[in-house]
């Protein structure tokens, strides 16, 4: 649990996620501001359905991605690599996620883009501030944590 708490605290301080999807052998990546839900271990993002990445995702798809800062030295590198599943939210689930997203990013109130959830199933957190190459791993299905 300690690993997930550490990762969640770091993710809560960031705000841009890069995620990638594939369809019929074609890969595509995108960036978005995100809201992180530590209880569900999921990102919430807004993106229009007409975008290439949304079209490739369909209602639900496998996803992989990263969250990272922009440090000036190797010793300060911190970042997450993940894999999971992206899906478009509907109904009350979408409404609740949008309310939380709008609290974090008030400018989003002007956007009508659908809300998507990226559920994280595997997370690898690299934190060179704890020592070069220090990694922490969390897996949803097994509840496994490695430091």
Curated annotation (Swiss-Prot):
Source species: Shigella sonnei (strain Ss046)
Protein name: UPF0306 protein YhbP
Protein family: Belongs to the UPF0306 family.
């Amino acid at each position: 649990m300690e690993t997930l708490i550490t990762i969640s605290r770091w993710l809560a301080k960031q705000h841009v996620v890069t995620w990638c999807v594939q369809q019929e052998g074609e890969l595509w990546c995108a960036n978005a501001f995100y809201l992180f839900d530590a209880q569900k271990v999921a990102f919430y993002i807004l993106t229009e359905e007409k975008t290439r990445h949304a079209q490739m995702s369909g209602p639900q798809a496998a996803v992989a991605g990263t969250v990272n800062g922009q440090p000036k030295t190797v010793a300060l590198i911190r970042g997450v690599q993940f894999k999971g599943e992206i899906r478009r939210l509907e109904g009350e689930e979408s409404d609740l996620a949008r309310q939380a997203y709008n609290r974090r990013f008030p400018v989003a109130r002007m956007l009508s883009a659908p809300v998507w959830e990226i559920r994280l199933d595997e997370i690898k957190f690299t934190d060179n501030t704890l020592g070069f190459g220090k990694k922490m791993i969390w897996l949803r299905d097994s509840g496994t944590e490695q430091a």
